[in-house]
Each structure stands twice: as C-alpha cells, then as structure tokens.
A protein has these predicted regions:
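A domain-start/cap signature at the N-terminus of enzymes
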Residues: 20-37, 91-159
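Amphipathic, heptad-repeat alpha-helical segments
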Residues: 20-78
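Gly/Ser-rich "nucleophile elbow"/oxyanion-hole loop immediately N-terminal to the catalytic nucleophile
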Residues: 153-157, 206-239, 249-255, 276, ...
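Active-site machinery of serine-nucleophile hydrolases
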Residues: 156-225
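Mobile cap/lid helix-loop segments that gate and shape the active-site cleft of serine hydrolases
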Residues: 169-181, 253-300, 304-305, 319
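Short beta-strand immediately N-terminal to the catalytic nucleophile in serine-hydrolase-like folds
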Residues: 234-236, 259-261, 310
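Hydrolases whose catalytic domains are alpha/beta-hydrolase-1, hotdog thioesterase
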Residues: 243-247, 259
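Conserved strand-to-loop "acid loop" that flanks and positions the catalytic carboxylate
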Residues: 306-315
Length: 322
C-alpha cells in the first residue's frame, strides 16, 4: 500500500472523505490509513519467521523456473502474499487482531503457491470461484494485487467481465484486500461472468497510479482468461462509483457499458453539496487540477458507452447521477 498521500491532499482526500471544512486545517487532518493495533510479540515473531520462510521459497522457485516463459506473470501471484504481510507489519497496518489470522493464512497460501511454482505449476490459474492474482506494475515495478471471481461455468470461451472498483476503506491495507478477495464474492456476481476487483493503490478512487493499476490488472488477467473485449463492464459504488465515472468518460472505447453508483463526477459540485465546502476560495491551480478527473468535461464520450447511474434517493452523492 503506502501511497504518497501528500500529492492527493488538495484534491482526493477532501473529495473522498465527508469531514467537511474542518478537515482543511492541518491540525485536524486524520492520519490515513489510521495507526494499526498493537500486535502481540509472539504473533509478530511467528509472522516474521513465516516471512523469512516464504522469501526463501520464492527465491528457490525463481531460481528453479528461471527459464519458465510465464515466470514474470506468475511470480507476482506468489510475491503478493509476502508483500501484504511484510507491509502490514512494517507500516503498522494491522488494524484489528483478526488480521493476524489473515496474515498467517496469507503466508500459508504464499508458501503453497511458491512450492507449486518451483515445480513449474500454477494451479491457481485454473481455479474457479475466488482467486487472488497480482501483477508487476509498469509504473514502479511494485507487485499489485487484484481479485477475480471465476464462474463455475467458465471453460475457456470468451466471457463477459465486470470490473468492480471498491468503495472507500481507510483500513483496506493490501493484507486486508487480499484476505477479502480470498473470502468474499463482493457486491456483484453476474451469472456466467468474471468479476475483476482492482485494488487501485488503496483508497484514492482509482486516481493517478490507481487508474493505471486497474488497466494493468485487466491486461494481466487477459493473459490467463478469455475475456471478451466486447463485453467488459465498468462498475463501482460510492468512491468506486467515482472511479467508474472517470473510467467511463476517459476510456469509453474499452467498455460495453458503465454502471457508476453514488459516486462523485465533478469535484466542485461534490465538495459544495456533499461536504459543504466553499469552493470559491480555492486557488486557481486547485480549480485547474480538478478538471483532471471531472467526468462532466468529457461527458460527450458517453455516446460511445451506454451508462446507467444509480444512487439512494436521499444520498447527497445522488447529485452525480442527476
């Protein structure tokens, strides 16, 4: 995880949170993500030892399969478990003690995959149901997770695929996300369709690196699954709805349809209506940069992408759908 949130302060943070004007005061800004809980020493020692064991297994698999044609695309599927646990401990991002168990399970799954990869096998690529995958980002070389829901009916024929952008979650560390994607189907599960859940660099509404991450996750998934390019749907709710709006207007040619839910589509209106901000006092460069992701600026592109927006009738974020 660990994105540099400083660059988002003037733009994303206030737009995603509902804290209002008081959150513009430096002394009032909450740390994001919040500090984690105190992990018992015994658990920390066990997890640290598990990390060392997994790191060794990853190195052995890498050496044994150095000439494997798919090594570069399969290795992140193993490394993602090491990174998730390592960063959770390193950056104090275990936010509840139940995540200690999730860390143990992540290390076990990582070790299982490493041992299989050492033998040149990758059984998770044939797995149905919930599948945790990962790829190496072209932006910074980091391993980034994403989740898949593979229907039982999938046999390798071209299939509809829905991309679901997740909502706000300040404690959604990479460990929490990997655990979630291994255990929860999620908000949507269309019949006979694959669902792809991008992590999108934590809680930034798939902006900046999070934007490219969703596209890279799709690119990686296409290497292993017969995704029908004519049946890819862009979806999301709340903060994920905001992401769906931007993807719909900026990449209208990639989707057969878009389905944003309760997500802001333009910054000034959202800040004023949802957070009671006085946007008239914003600097010229803030207002200029808002247009980077203001979906209304490129709404004409929706002629190429059928779009159905939805929201609760008393939700202030209904403004975007209206």
């Amino acid at each position: 995880m660990k994105p540099n949130l400083a660059i988002l302060a003037f733009f994303i943070t206030s737009a995603v949170l509902a804290d209002g004007p008081k959150d513009n005061l430096a002394d009032n800004v909450r740390p994001i993500p919040p500090p984690g809980v105190q992990v018992p020493d015994a658990d920390k020692t066990r997890l640290t030892e598990g990390l060392a064991k997994l790191r060794s297994a990853i190195d052995e698999a890498t050496k044994a399969q150095s000439k494997h044609p798919l090594l570069a695309d399969l290795l992140p599927d193993v490394e993602v478990y090491h990174k998730a646990v390592d960063w959770a401990l390193r950056y104090n991002e275990i936010h509840k003690l139940a995540e200690v168990k999730a860390a143990d399970q992540a290390l076990a799954e990582g070790l299982k995959r490493a041992e299989a990869l050492k033998e040149g096998k990758a059984p998770w690529t044939q797995q149905k149901g919930l599948v945790v995958r990962a790829y190496r980002s072209k932006i910074d070389g980091s391993v980034q997770p994403y989740g898949l829901v593979i229907p039982d009916s999938y046999v390798g024929a071209p299939v509809r695929t829905d991309i679901w952008c997740h909502g706000r979650g300040e404690t959604l560390s990479e460990l929490a996300f990997v655990d979630q994607r291994a255990k929860q189907v999620g908000n949507v599960q269309p019949k006979d369709a694959i669902v792809l859940h991008p992590y999108g660099r934590y809680c930034c509404a798939n902006k900046f690196a999070g934007e490219i991450d969703a596209l890279e996750a799709l690119e990686h998934a296409k290497k292993f699954y017969a995704i029908d390019d004519d049946r890819i749907v862009m979806r999301g709710f709340s903060m994920g709805g905001a992401a769906a709006w931007q993807f719909a207007v900026h990449y209208a040619d990639l989707w057969c349809a878009a389905n944003p839910g309760a997500g802001f589509a333009e910054t000034a209106e959202f800040l004023g209506g949802f957070q009671s901000e006085d946007v008239s006092t914003a600097s010229w460069y803030q207002k200029k940069l808002w247009h980077w992701y203001d979906a209304t600026d490129n709404a004409l592109n929706l002629q190429m992408c059928p779009t159905i927006a939805y929201s609760g009738e008393i939700d202030k974020q209904k403004q975007a759908a209206d």
